[in-house]
Amino acid sequence: MAAGPVEDNCISLVEMKFIDNTLYFVAENDENLESDYFGRLEPKLSIIRNLNDQVLFINQGNQPVFEDMPDSDCTDNAPQTVFIIYMYKDSLTRGLAVTISVKCEKTSTLSCKNKIISFKEMSPPENINDEGNDIIFFQRSVPGHDDKIQFESSLYKGYFLACEKENDLFKLILKEKDENGDKSVMFTVQNQN
């Protein structure tokens, strides 16, 4: 039995035009086209650790820090150690788009506004109509490391969540990735559900 061509598997282009040295294609019928946006999917509850096996948690000042913590303490302190990672459908292919939230008394969502990491008191929205946003990160696996993950900012290309020692604290920061095997941008994500 021979395979036949699949019908209606393309967009008919009826017109092309140059505007300011950019070629634009005009679709005959654009009712099925989507604009660039992120659409929220189901969440995962996760514990995030740095490469020193320290657990990410929210301290009393609502700041994300890493600390040595046995699994039993993670369970006892679940509101501060279990993060809600919402996955988003992305209209572009750039990695798994996610937000990272925590629910202590209220829901707070991780933001990298002005390249500063903080938690905003807000629930992640259902849809985000931007191509880049301060609360969206691209979760990707690290080549050569089966169980390691990195999170790139959708707003600041080339900037990643990282662990950095500051005084006696290990803090979560946003930094430009060093191409020489920077391990500070690698994490393990242990799903709880």
Swiss-Prot record:
<dbReference type="GO" id="GO:0050830">
    <property type="term" value="P:defense response to Gram-positive bacterium"/>
</dbReference>
<dbReference type="GO" id="GO:0051092">
    <property type="term" value="P:positive regulation of NF-kappaB transcription factor activity"/>
</dbReference>
<comment type="subunit">
    <text>Forms a ternary complex with ligand-binding receptor subunit IL18R1 and signaling receptor subunit IL18RAP at the plasma membrane. Mature IL18 first binds to IL18R1 forming a low affinity binary complex, which then interacts with IL18RAP to form a high affinity ternary complex that signals inside the cell. Interacts with cargo receptor TMED10; the interaction mediates the translocation from the cytoplasm into the ERGIC (endoplasmic reticulum-Golgi intermediate compartment) and thereby secretion.</text>
</comment>
<dbReference type="GO" id="GO:0050729">
    <property type="term" value="P:positive regulation of inflammatory response"/>
</dbReference>
<dbReference type="InterPro" id="IPR015529">
    <property type="entry name" value="IL-18"/>
</dbReference>
<dbReference type="GO" id="GO:0061436">
    <property type="term" value="P:establishment of skin barrier"/>
</dbReference>
<dbReference type="GO" id="GO:0005615">
    <property type="term" value="C:extracellular space"/>
</dbReference>
<dbReference type="InterPro" id="IPR008996">
    <property type="entry name" value="IL1/FGF"/>
</dbReference>
<keyword id="KW-0964">Secreted</keyword>
<dbReference type="GO" id="GO:0071222">
    <property type="term" value="P:cellular response to lipopolysaccharide"/>
</dbReference>
<feature type="site" description="Cleavage; by CASP3">
    <location>
        <begin position="71"/>
        <end position="72"/>
    </location>
</feature>
<dbReference type="GO" id="GO:0005125">
    <property type="term" value="F:cytokine activity"/>
</dbReference>
<dbReference type="Pfam" id="PF00340">
    <property type="entry name" value="IL1"/>
</dbReference>
<dbReference type="GO" id="GO:0006954">
    <property type="term" value="P:inflammatory response"/>
</dbReference>
<comment type="function">
    <text>Pro-inflammatory cytokine primarily involved in epithelial barrier repair, polarized T-helper 1 (Th1) cell and natural killer (NK) cell immune responses. Upon binding to IL18R1 and IL18RAP, forms a signaling ternary complex which activates NF-kappa-B, triggering synthesis of inflammatory mediators. Synergizes with IL12/interleukin-12 to induce IFNG synthesis from T-helper 1 (Th1) cells and natural killer (NK) cells.</text>
</comment>
<feature type="site" description="Cleavage; by CASP1, CASP4 and CASP5">
    <location>
        <begin position="36"/>
        <end position="37"/>
    </location>
</feature>
<dbReference type="GO" id="GO:0005829">
    <property type="term" value="C:cytosol"/>
</dbReference>
<dbReference type="InterPro" id="IPR000975">
    <property type="entry name" value="IL-1_fam"/>
</dbReference>
<keyword id="KW-0395">Inflammatory response</keyword>
<dbReference type="GO" id="GO:0032729">
    <property type="term" value="P:positive regulation of type II interferon production"/>
</dbReference>
<dbReference type="GO" id="GO:2000556">
    <property type="term" value="P:positive regulation of T-helper 1 cell cytokine production"/>
</dbReference>
<dbReference type="GO" id="GO:0006955">
    <property type="term" value="P:immune response"/>
</dbReference>
<keyword id="KW-0963">Cytoplasm</keyword>
<dbReference type="GO" id="GO:0019221">
    <property type="term" value="P:cytokine-mediated signaling pathway"/>
</dbReference>
<feature type="propeptide">
    <location>
        <begin position="1"/>
        <end position="36"/>
    </location>
</feature>
<keyword id="KW-0202">Cytokine</keyword>
<protein>
    <recommendedName>
        <fullName>Interleukin-18</fullName>
    </recommendedName>
</protein>
<dbReference type="GO" id="GO:0045515">
    <property type="term" value="F:interleukin-18 receptor binding"/>
</dbReference>
<comment type="similarity">
    <text>Belongs to the IL-1 family.</text>
</comment>
<dbReference type="GO" id="GO:0035655">
    <property type="term" value="P:interleukin-18-mediated signaling pathway"/>
</dbReference>
